Amino acid sequence: MRTMDNATLFAIIFVIAGASTLQFYKGRKLNLQLMQHYLRSIEEVVKPEDKDYVWLGGYIGFRAVYKVNRDNLRKFEYTLTLLPRHSLLYFPIALLTSRHDKIYFVIRPFAEIKREAHLIQKGYYRLKPNIENEEFLQRETIEIAGREYEALYEKKRDMVKLKKLVESLSKPHNVKHVSLTPKTNVFYVLMKPEPETIEKDVEKLVRFTNEKLRESPFSS
C-alpha cells in the first residue's frame, strides 16, 4: 500500500512538473509576443525622437519613455504589466488579484494643464488612489458604455472632454482611470490593452493631447 502511495505521489509530482514546464514555455512565448506587439504598435504611432526601455523582470512587462518634442507632445511614457502566463501556480492567483493585463500611460504635454479632472471606473480599485485636494472637487457618477464612473473635477467641461475621449476609444469599458493633473502636468490613462486595437487607441490619445490639451478649458 505504501509503495502504491509513493508511486501515486511520484506520478502526481511528475504530471505537475510537466504541466508547469509546458505552461512556462507557452506563457513565456505569448507574453514576449505581446510585449513585442505593443512596443512596435505604440512606437509606430508616437514616433519618438529618443526612446528608453526598462525591463520589469521575468516576462511581465517593461517601461518605455519616449521623448517626442513634436506638436503638443513633449514626452510619452507607458508601463505595460502582463499577467504571469508562464507560471502555472501564480497565474490563477494573478487572475484574482491583477485580473488582466494593464497599461499605464503618462503623457506630458507642452501646454499647461490648469485644472484637475478624473474619471474612475467604479469598483475597479480595491484601495482608492490618493487625489490631491479631492475634497474641493465636484463629484458625480456618470455612465460610459454601460459602466459607472466616478467623476471628480473642478469644471464640468473638463470632465465632458474626458468622457468624450473614453467613449471614442475602441472598448471604452477597458479604461479604468483617466485624469488630468495640474501639479505634475500629466495626462494619465490606465486601461486594459487589446492587441487588435492598441494602435488606434494610442492614436486617439496622441490626437487628444495635440488638439484638446491646447484648447480651453485645459490650457487657458
Residue ranges and their predicted role:
Residues 73-199:
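Structured extramembrane domains adjacent to transmembrane segments
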Residues 17-27:
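Terminal, regulation- and interaction-focused segments at domain boundaries
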Residues 25-99:
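N-terminal topogenic membrane-targeting module
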Residues 38, 42-50, 166-169, 209-217:
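Hydrophobic, Leu/Ile/Phe/Ala-enriched alpha-helical segments that form helix-helix packing faces
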Residues 48-59, 175-182, 218-220:
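Short glycine-rich, low-complexity/disordered patches
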Residues 12-16, 33-36:
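Conserved structured core elements
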Residues 1-12:
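Feature marks short, highly hydrophobic, charge-poor N-terminal signal-anchor/signal peptide-like helices
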Residues 185-220:
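Long, compositionally biased interface segments
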